[in-house]
Swiss-Prot record:
Domain of life of the source: Bacteria
Origin organism lineage: Bacteria, Bacillati, Bacillota, Clostridia, Lachnospirales
Signal sequence range: none
Residues the entry annotates as binding substrate: N157
Function: Alpha-galacturonidase able to catalyze the hydrolysis of the chromogenic substrate p-nitrophenyl-alpha-D-galacturonic acid (pNPalphaGalUA). It is probable that alpha-1,4-di-galacturonate (GalUA(2)) is the naturally occurring substrate.
Subunit comment: Homotetramer.
Species per Swiss-Prot/TrEMBL record: Lachnoclostridium phytofermentans (strain ATCC 700394 / DSM 18823 / ISDg) (Clostridium phytofermentans)
Pfam (any one): Glyco_hydro_4
Name used for this protein in its record: Alpha-galacturonidase
Top-level EC class: hydrolase
GO molecular function: galacturan 1,4-alpha-galacturonidase activity; metal ion binding; oxidoreductase activity, acting on the CH-OH group of donors, NAD or NADP as acceptor
Chain residues that bind Mn(2+): C179, H216
Length: 466
């Protein structure tokens, strides 16, 4: 990297999953709008055609007159080629296909177990982790060999398991996980504050929060705007609007069809006194099944949705068609801020600015005092030149710890199961997951695990002997 007049050039970013038809385009547009950084993006993907298409799309963006951040995009034929000389590594992959995810999400429904997302917790999240961990073992070993000093940014779910695997394989890695769910909750607070305080256009970044939890089961125990404590305002809003909830307009591609009225957040606040800081669809999967996911009628009553894999397949088809239009020049990507912070964090790690944002990293410094040091936790951190300094978030209330610990323990079980090919550990994790617990007999759980492993065996190591 070269520095001159407050700018940095010759930055190399390796993008693992560089054929992405969602996050990659968001990444490209944010880079194109940042005038103080430039360099090379090396795109690696097992689908080389998809990576090649993104190379074309990225370079078309670079050639545009309205692009201020100039980057050269190239396709790498191997992970080694992409990683060699990289200053930053971005990981954004789909572990398996939506056919495997169809089994993840819908196979447990035969036992009355419903999942609103199926990529983090619950049977679907754990099965996805078993596919993902071997991939991340390979990626971590490659980073260790070819770019050990690079900063590694993960966007892949299940976030906690991905980051945990990177550190398990390469303890000295400089890796962290980025997730936008906290931003979404800040936007809810922004909207409520604008209504209740009669203020126009509050900037989300002016909503200051203390973040603590694990990914997709994250909480605020502090929220303020220009010295105003937002907790009493949030509490009063819930008292007045619990039944109708809060609706917002969200143009982010990743959230557009995931709308909810945030009534699950409101319900959790009434019980625990903290602001739950993730989408309702994610939050529900960390709670006992009967509370929010008992059946489709209960889901409808709480005003969120079950994201079906059929919808995901249709969405992928739409994005494939969009990719063809972008490559041909029939359509052009709009250059507008995505609301994501990945590029801002890279800019901070380059030393051009200083940023506080939420991050998923090991709890090594006990930034959440009463969670294990081996857990991957989500808290705020300070990003500056070649450094991430986690902010001490304090203690999590014990009643929230009790909800969180089964998932942290399951991370340990699933990690060990993935590395030792131990089916009994998968069964153990399923049995204590709150979506599964009390919903099935041991024999039914064992059969479910057997069938789900069989459905995903194409992406599992042969040592599973399936």
């Amino acid at each position: 990297m070269k520095y001159n007049n407050g700018k940095v050039s010759d930055v190399k970013i390796a993008y693992i999953g560089g054929g992405s038809r969602g996050w990659a385009w968001t990444f490209m547009t944010d880079l194109a709008m940042e005038p103080n950084m430039s360099g090379k993006i090396s795109l690696y993907d097992i689908d080389q055609e998809a990576a090649k298409n993104n190379e074309i799309i990225g370079n078309m963006i670079t050639r545009r007159d309205d692009t201020v951040g100039k980057w050269n995009y190239e396709t790498a034929n191997t992970m080694e080629a992409a990683l060699t000389g990289a200053d930053f590594v971005v990981i954004s992959i789909l572990p398996g296909t939506f056919d495997e995810m169809e089994a993840d999400v819908h196979m447990p429904e035969r036992l009355g177990i419903y999942q609103s997302v199926g990529d983090t917790a619950g049977p679907g999240g754990m099965m996805r982790a078993l596919r993902t961990i071997p991939m991340f073992v390979t990626i971590a070993n490659a980073i260790k060999e070819y770019s050990p000093k690079a900063w590694v940014i993960n966007y892949t779910n299940p976030m906690s398991m991905c980051v945990k695997t990177l550190y398990h394989v390469f303890p000295e890695i400089k890796a962290f996980g980025c997730c936008h769910e906290v931003f979404g909750t800040q936007k809810v607070l922004k909207g409520i504050a604008e209504q209740e305080l009669k203020i126009d256009r509050i900037d989300r970044n002016d909503i200051h929060v203390n973040v603590l939890g694990i990914n997709h089961f994250t909480w605020f125990n502090y929220a303020s705007y220009q010295g105003i404590d937002l907790f009493p305002i949030y509490c009063k809003y819930i008292e007045d609007h619990f039944e109708e909830g809060f609706e917002e307009k969200d143009e982010n591609w990743a959230n557009a069809s995931f709308a909810c009225k945030h009534r699950v957040k409101f319900d959790l606040f009434n019980e625990f006194g903290l602001i739950a800081a993730a989408g309702d669809r994610h939050l529900t999967e960390f709670m006992p099944s009967e509370r929010y996911l008992k059946d489709k009628e209960t889901v409808a009553d709480w005003n969120f949705g079950l994201t079906t894999v059929e919808w995901r397949k249709k969405d992928l088809e739409d994005r494939l068609n969009k990719s063809h239009r972008l490559v041909s020049g029939e359509e052009e990507i709009k250059l507008e801020p995505s609301g994501e912070e990945g590029i801002l964090l890279i800019k901070a790690l380059c030393g051009l600015t200083r940023v506080i944002s939420n991050v998923n990293i090991p709890n090594t410094n006990l930034q959440i005092e009463n969670l294990p040091s081996t857990a991957i936790v989500e808290t705020n951190a300070v990003f500056e030149r070649d450094s991430i300094r986690p902010i001490m978030a304090g203690e999590m209330p014990e009643n929230v710890v009790k909800l969180t610990m089964p998932h942290i323990l399951n991370h340990e079980y699933i990690m060990e199961a993935a590395l030792t090919f131990d089916k009994s550990l998968v069964v153990k994790a399923f049995e204590q997951d709150p979506l599964v617990k009390d919903m099935a007999t041991k024999e039914e759980v064992e059969k479910l695990v057997e069938d789900m492993l069989d459905a995903t065996k194409a992406y599992l190591p042969k040592e599973w002997n399936l």
